[in-house]
Amino acid sequence: GHGVAHIGGVHEAPNGFRWRIVPERNDSCVLEEGMITTDEPGIYVEGSHGIRTENELLCVKGNANEYGQFMHFEALTMAPIDLDAVLPENMTAAEKKYLNDYHALVREKLSPYFDEEESRWLAHVTRAI
């Protein structure tokens, strides 16, 4: 993932996530309240193709204790994940719960703006797996 600018580059420092630290990118900072970061799970088949589902997340304060201030993320992107591309049998219980909770949030946030037919479509594409 990476930071997001309002009117600027797609990859906005200083926040970012990678499988390894890349010092010259200057995007391995401590996350702060209010930062927007992308979450980009995907699959890449070397030499062939790749696909990502990219959502934007807001960093918010969570619990504080003797170890410090903990942060968590709230989803900003409200769009269904294509369930035709999901293999539930390859997912852990925690991953299924995350997807089902996200889809419930998408329904909650979007359904007030949809008519009856659109709401039926939304219910179908955000059904629990």
Give, region by region, the residue ranges found by the protein language model.
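Charged, cofactor-coupling segments
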Residues: G3-I129
